[in-house]
């Protein structure tokens, strides 16, 4: 049975899992809550989606430190939604990466989305006082970007409108693993916000 996503009536803590899904590739999950991907390279770590608050992000960091002491240098934002990005400051990464469209949506809708998700998902925003503000990318790209973590290559790709107008995926060629943000759901219907109904399957076949 699929786990329900956090809501106003969902105040119980979820069981955290930290699962290796490929060589030095990890998935931080918590029974249907927003997840985080972890890519460990030769010399550094990349985070895919940052969690809703620094409090939750620190739980990710704790799990990372159980498997590596390499520095976290990159945080990748798959899209702009508050529950996935506002924990970014906890990683102390030198670069925060997103699509140009995602950056535009943070400008246009970031505060509105923060206010909305804060009201709808109170459990995810426990400890919200530590959020320093909206999460702003330091690097953006239009279509594709390659990040080298030593010998490990990560391909970041904007494949068209999907869950939002600016979603990206992260592909790790050496393990054939892709992190998809909210474009793909497991045992659950997609969370519909600004989804583009006519286009969401196209990126999966690109």
Predicted regions: what they are:
Residues 17-63, 168-182:
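Conserved beta-strand hairpin/beta-sheet module of binuclear metal-dependent hydrolase folds
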Residues 18, 42-44, 54-98:
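Active-site metal-binding motif and surrounding structural segment of the metallo-beta-lactamase
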Residues 24, 39, 49, 64, ...:
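Divalent metal-coordination and catalytic microenvironments
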Residues 27, 46-49, 73-76, 155-156:
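Short catalytic-loop micro-motif centered on adjacent basic/acidic residues
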Residues 54-55, 80-86, 103-106, 164-167, ...:
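Active-site environment of divalent metal-dependent phosphoester hydrolases
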Residues 104-159, 173-174:
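Metallo-beta-lactamase
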Residues 143-145, 149-194:
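Ligand/cofactor pocket segment of small-molecule handling proteins
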Residues 195-199, 203-206:
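Single conserved hydrophobic/aromatic residue that forms the stacking wall/gate
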